[in-house]
């Protein structure tokens, strides 16, 4: 197999890690249907991307999964998607999982959302909020809940206009399910 496919790749997954009916799991994931050698964004493959293009897929879910390919497995088939920002394979190995609600994830992967957290902190500071409480919250398991509550503030979105904040607001029901375990009204 080509060295191009050695190393670590990534996939953004939903909370339940099901995409187009395929249920992903830790470890080996094998495509059930026939593999599509040609086409773009088509069925017949398990899609993944590299670190350079990861930011293009942040709206696809709430987890980033590390992906490796079983290069010594004779069953493995891989193609680069014609779009240039993703790949398709019939076998993916799922490794570590990182939450997109954790600011450290964005720092680790050098993703644009790190600017969002900076803007949120600037917004909190400029509005005479208890900055220390928010800073502590960003470091705790309850940080996502507080971030969610701040993101609901229309003025934060209007002043900063971050695309990711807008996405989170537009999809607040799914964010609430992840953060609270149920939809909030």
Question: Each predicted region: which residue ranges?
Answer:
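ADP-ribose/NAD+-binding catalytic cleft of ART/PARP-like enzymes
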Residues: 1-43, 59
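A helicase ATPase "motif cassette" and its flanking acidic/Ser/Thr-rich regulatory loops
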Residues: 50
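Conserved NAD+-utilizing ADP-ribose enzyme module
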Residues: 1-6, 42-44, 55-64, 68-185
